[in-house]
Amino acid sequence: MRFDILTLFPEFFTSPLQTSLLGKALANEVAEVHLTNPRDFTTDKHHRVDDEVYGGGVGMLMKPEPIFAAVESLPCLPRRQIVLFTPQGRPMDQPLFHELANHYDQLVMICGHYEGVDERVAEHLVTQELSLGDFVLTCGEIPALTLLNGVIRLRPGTVGKVESLKKESFETELLDYPQYTRPAEFRGWQVPSVLRSGNHALIERWRQEQQIQRTRDRRPDLYQKWLKKSDTSDP
């Protein structure tokens, strides 16, 4: 799978692309990531990528010409999505990551800066607008790295034990259960005895109960989704 990231700050991705899961996935050619700087596609001597907002307003806006030129310079695989990160975009979640990982060969991600990008980019170039959440960040590189990580880890060959992906939070609308490691006692806090019992049926039941309780207490919205899904799956 190919990822193209349009960014004014390619160095932002230097360390993340060389370490941990992403670094291994790229080294094993599970995916390929290409960084493109829109500034390289400017035509003026100052390499300007931003300008004032029509109608007045605070701050600067990224110009459309370098962004269009940068995207049009890229290879176009058959199943491609061009993503722009904006507050009004679709919230990123696990179903979205699965959708992108399973149905597309190429993701082009446009990282905004300043007050955003010219609306014509969203109207005539972008195929999907995405949002990391209801808060403001300084740049689009942060959601781009999040999307990159979330999608690549679902691609075959990235995670060693595929079964572990199916048991993670959000895969079944439920949060993950509590997990413990050695020592069995730390500062008087004990690992639940059921986890040390060796009875796998009891352990599985305890984990499911903990998932349901934790989701109900901490994420009532997800709990309601899980209830609805459980109702529809009953015979």
Curated annotation (Swiss-Prot):
Q: Name one GO cellular component term.
A: cytosol
Q: Which keywords fit this entry according to its UniProt record?
A: Cytoplasm, Methyltransferase, S-adenosyl-L-methionine, Transferase, tRNA processing
**Which CDD domains has this protein been placed in?**
TrmD-like (cd18080)
S-adenosyl-L-methionine in keyword set: yes
Describe the subunit structure. Homodimer.
Q: What is its EC number?
A: 2.1.1.228
Which residues of the sequence carry a binding annotation for S-adenosyl-L-methionine?
A: G112, L132, G133, D134, F135, V136, L137
GO MF assignments: tRNA (guanine(37)-N1)-methyltransferase activity
Which reaction is this enzyme known to catalyze? guanosine(37) in tRNA + S-adenosyl-L-methionine = N(1)-methylguanosine(37) in tRNA + S-adenosyl-L-homocysteine + H(+)
Question: InterPro entries in the record, alphabetically?
Answer: Alpha/beta_knot_MTases, tRNA_m1G_MeTrfase_C_sf, tRNA_m1G_MeTrfase_TrmD, tRNA_m1G_MTases_N, tRNA_MeTrfase_TRMD/TRM10
- Which species is this UniProt entry from? Acaryochloris marina (strain MBIC 11017)
Family statement drawn from the similarity comment of this UniProt entry: Belongs to the RNA methyltransferase TrmD family.
Subcellular locations according to the entry:
Cytoplasm
| Gene that this sequence comes from | trmD
| Described purpose of this protein according to its UniProt entry | Specifically methylates guanosine-37 in various tRNAs.
* GO BP term (any one): tRNA N1-guanine methylation
> In the record, which residues are listed under signal peptide?
none
Per its UniProt entry, which superkingdom is the organism in? Bacteria
Classification via Gene3D superfamilies = 3.40.1280.10, tRNA(m1g37)methyltransferase, domain 2
Its main subcellular localisation, reduced to a broad class, is cytoplasm
What is the protein named?
Answer: tRNA (guanine-N(1)-)-methyltransferase
